[in-house]
């Protein structure tokens, strides 16, 4: 039933976009991995390295084992008819940068630490993928909101409306990322806990 409702909502959105002359947007995802290196032979050495080298959350000032930064970019074209400005096409670019640990001397680590690390890294990737999916959703929501923009009297008005929608979507999705981290205890409830 949920799938049917989603399909109907998407069909209505597409239908509305086509009736207003807005071409469906292309949404591009660019995913970048930024690895930071850690060394150690056992769990406690690795934990010390994670605690001292992990990426810092700019909002809280705390270090975490991994972090996903994201941003939205957009390009658009508009047309004028009878002195009114209307969006004719747009594209959205979602950039997600995942800051992630790399155990560089894993082959010299003790076997238990290696096994625990592999499970941990798998679960940490899964948690960060959740952030990437939220960022993709933000791109889709921005696209939908831009497709629903009406006509404006000036070029400045349409550009301000686009900027306002982007800021609104970014603010809402930033809160969703914070809620995701709160609900998962920054991935710990998903098994992203070491040791």
Where do the model's predicted regions map?
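Metalloprotease/metallohydrolase-associated module, dominated by Zn2+-dependent proteases
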Residues: 27-108, 152-195
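Active-site recognition of the HExxH zinc-binding catalytic motif
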Residues: 123-135
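Bacterial N-terminal signal peptides that target proteins for export
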Residues: 1-12
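Post-HEXXH active-site segment of zinc metalloproteases
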Residues: 108-119, 135-166
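N-terminal signal peptide c-region/cleavage motif recognized by signal peptidases
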Residues: 19-21
């Amino acid at each position: 039933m949920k799938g049917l409702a989603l399909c109907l909502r998407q069909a209505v959105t597409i239908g509305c976009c086509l009736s207003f002359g807005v071409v469906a947007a292309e949404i591009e995802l660019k995913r970048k991995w930024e690895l930071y290196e850690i060394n150690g032979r056992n769990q406690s050495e690795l934990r010390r390295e994670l605690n001292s080298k992990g990426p810092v959350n700019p909002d809280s000032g705390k270090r975490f084992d991994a972090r996903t930064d994201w941003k939205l970019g957009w390009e658009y074209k508009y047309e004028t008819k009878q002195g009114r400005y209307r969006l004719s096409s747009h594209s959205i670019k979602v950039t997600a940068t995942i800051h992630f640990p790399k155990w560089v001397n894993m082959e010299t680590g003790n076997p238990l630490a290696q096994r625990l690390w592999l499970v941990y890294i798998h679960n940490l990737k899964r948690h960060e993928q959740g952030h990437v999916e939220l960022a993709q959703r933000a791109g889709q929501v921005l696209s939908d909101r831009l497709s629903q923009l009406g006509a404006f009297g000036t070029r400045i008005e349409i550009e301000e409306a686009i900027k306002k929608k982007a800021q609104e979507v970014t603010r809402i999705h930033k809160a969703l990322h914070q809620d995701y981290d709160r609900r998962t205890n920054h991935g710990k409830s998903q098994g992203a806990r070491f040791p």
